[in-house]
Amino acid sequence: MIVHWPGKHKQGYVCDTPVVSTDFYPTILEMVGLPTRPKQHPDGVSLTSLIQGGKFIERDGIYWHFPHYSNHGMQSPGGAIRVGDWKLLEYFENGTVQLFNLKKDLGEQHDLSLREPEKAAQLLSQLRDWRKRVGANMMPPNPAWQR
């Protein structure tokens, strides 16, 4: 993410904190002096303090939810969670998961779900709890679809 905000941050400042597009809305609201609207961006947090070189607000994870077929990189409906260096992918069609340590495997080439079953179960539980908390819609079955 590249930010130009004259007089508000040091030129050339680089930060390696993960952010997600849902953070843009509360960030822009705060940048222009408007109040944030948490009901409109329940997962987004303002990045203004981060942009200005301060501490980032801690969050319990970054979540993705794609309950449909798309070209977003996932081949089938699924969800994902990132917490620290760990990322878990859940595939809704067959109930499988993949687990990656992004610090050691940024390209997500080595699935650790069988080697780290406790971590996979913890993240899967956290992902499913988040879906319930935000009322995430799941894809309804299509009775007309045939394999």
PLM feature segments, named:
Residues 8-10, 17, 22-102, 133-139, ...:
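C-terminal cap/loop subdomain of S1 sulfatases and analogous C-terminal strand-loop tails that border
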Residues 122-140:
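Charge-dense polyanion-binding interfaces
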Residues 1-3:
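Short glycine- and hydrophobic/aromatic-rich loop-to-beta-strand nucleating segment
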Residues 25, 109, 127:
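Generic structural marker for isolated residues within well-ordered, non-membrane alpha-helices
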Residues 105:
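Intrinsically disordered, low-complexity polar regions and short flexible loop motifs
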Residues 81, 120-123:
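Hydrophobic packing residues in well-ordered alpha-helices of helical domains and bundles
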Residues 110-118:
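Active-site-proximal N-terminal segment of extracellular/periplasmic enzymes that hydrolyze or transfer
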